[in-house]
């Protein structure tokens, strides 16, 4: 049994749908609120959370008449209370308040809090048996088996909100799980798609941030340039759809129009296409199992003219190879992969290491973790958070050696 409903299970929702948005002030939250804004007659907002942007959070709470609002930073509670003083909106601060927001009664929850901080709130929504649109990578990369098992046990539905996984979700509805032979996740190739390995090694921060298609945050844009982001998506797809690494392929597609493909036993391949706009997969999750009016630009294939595809290069982009290695290793290795990458990207942004050293730090951390005998199954959110914390410490310890080798 899967928590991801590959077929319409009769879950159509009549009347007004109650919504909670965890991470309402981030980029995914912004796209979600834009869609809610377009159809106020269909949705009622229960809870909203934000990290530290109190002004933005309070503005959204008032606009959508939220029942409860939580800010992750405990020090901002007074500021939030003051901003909402002329309303009857309840508010809180800190991790417990964010978890409370996730636990409140809502038909549909957008889990878009970034980082490991999003794991416990997403689990709180899952444990309530909610329909959860999942945009937090750590829930799957750091605790995939555990998270999906909890969702099944609670009767929760997990709807993939990431563009590639949502594409697979839509394409999988064309057949049955036992008929699937492989899924294909597409990658733009990033700004260094045609660069030589030596040039990629020396790439600057400004060059890494020039994504050809998507407008994203700094960290994810760098991950796209290194293809670490695609590695994370391979890991996520494995847990979401119960796929082995051998059932997941990556295909470089520079135009970012085809987002995912599914091949079935009869060798039919079903693909999902759309403009590179996160409002498309979010709208699919928001309306599921129905469809709602979109806010993104309509796709004009004649204007685009051609779609091209290439095999990924695991030599120039070793981060993708390392993701498959971590997935096959299991026992927390994918958590280590993600944690080490976050340390490496932060070091690159701070100009402590070269771009090419990002993958080397991830590989050295993974190897060090295995040699230390740290591999073990994760059976709780605290287990996953502990591995994440300790892997970051190991990566930080290895960082000076990596930096010295590159100098």
Curated annotation (Swiss-Prot):
Protein name: 1-deoxy-D-xylulose 5-phosphate reductoisomerase
EC number: 1.1.1.267
Enzymatic class: oxidoreductase
Family that this chain belongs to: Belongs to the DXR family.
Catalysed conversion reaction: 2-C-methyl-D-erythritol 4-phosphate + NADP(+) = 1-deoxy-D-xylulose 5-phosphate + NADPH + H(+)
Gene3D superfamilies reported in the protein's UniProt record: 1.10.1740.10, NAD(P)-binding Rossmann-like Domain
Alphabetically ordered keywords of this record: Isoprene biosynthesis, Manganese, Metal-binding, NADP, Oxidoreductase
Co-factor requirement: Mg(2+); Mn(2+)
Chain positions recorded as NADPH binding sites: 25-28, 53, 136, 138, 217
Keyword check for NADP: yes
InterPro entries according to UniProt: DXP_reductoisomerase, DXP_reductoisomerase_C, DXP_reductoisomerase_N, DXPR_C, DXPR_C_sf, NAD(P)-bd_dom_sf
Keyword Repressor: no
């Amino acid at each position: 049994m899967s928590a991801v409903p590959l077929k319409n299970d009769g879950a159509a929702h009549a009347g007004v749908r109650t919504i909670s948005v965890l991470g309402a002030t981030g980029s995914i939250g912004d796209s979600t609120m834009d869609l809610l804004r377009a159809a106020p007659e269909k949705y009622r907002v229960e809870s909203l959370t934000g990290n530290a942007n109190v002004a933005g959070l309070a503005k959204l709470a008032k606009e959508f008449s939220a029942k409860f609002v939580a800010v992750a930073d405990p020090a901002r509670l007074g500021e939030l209370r003051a901003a909402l003083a002329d309303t009857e909106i309840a508010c809180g601060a800190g991790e417990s308040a964010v978890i409370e927001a996730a636990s409140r009664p809502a038909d549909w929850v957008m889990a878009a809090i970034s980082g490991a901080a999003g794991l416990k709130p997403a689990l709180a929504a899952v444990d309530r048996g909610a329909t959860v649109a999942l945009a937090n990578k750590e829930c799957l990369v750091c605790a995939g088996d555990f998270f999906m098992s909890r969702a099944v046990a609670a009767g929760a539905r997990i709807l993939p909100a990431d563009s590639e996984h949502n594409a697979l979700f839509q394409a999988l509805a064309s057949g049955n799980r036992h008929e699937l032979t492989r899924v294909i996740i597409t990658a733009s190739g990033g700004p260094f798609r045609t660069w030589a390995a030596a040039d990629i090694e020396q790439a600057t921060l400004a060059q890494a941030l020039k994504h050809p298609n998507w407008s994203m945050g700094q960290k994810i844009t760098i991950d796209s340039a290194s293809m670490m982001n695609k590695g994370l998506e391979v890991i996520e797809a494995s847990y979401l759809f119960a796929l082995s690494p051998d059932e997941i392929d990556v295909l470089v597609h520079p135009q970012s129009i085809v987002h995912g493909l599914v091949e079935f036993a009869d060798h039919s391949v079903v693909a999902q296409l759309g403009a590179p706009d996160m409002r498309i997969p979010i709208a699919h999750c928001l309306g599921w199992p129905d469809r709602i009016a979109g806010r993104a630009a309509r796709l004009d294939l004649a204007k685009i003219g051609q779609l091209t595809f290439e095999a990924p290069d695991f030599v120039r982009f070793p981060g993708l190879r390392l993701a498959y290695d971590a997935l096959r290793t299991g026992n927390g290795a994918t958590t280590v992969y993600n944690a080490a990458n976050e340390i490496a990207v932060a070091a690159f942004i701070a100009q402590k290491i070269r771009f090419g050293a990002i993958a080397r730090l991830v590989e050295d951390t993974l190897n060090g973790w295995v040699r230390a005998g740290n591999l073990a199954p994760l059976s709780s959110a605290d287990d996953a958070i502990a591995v994440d914390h300790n892997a970051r410490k190991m990566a930080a310890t290895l960082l000076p050696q990596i930096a010295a080798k590159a100098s």
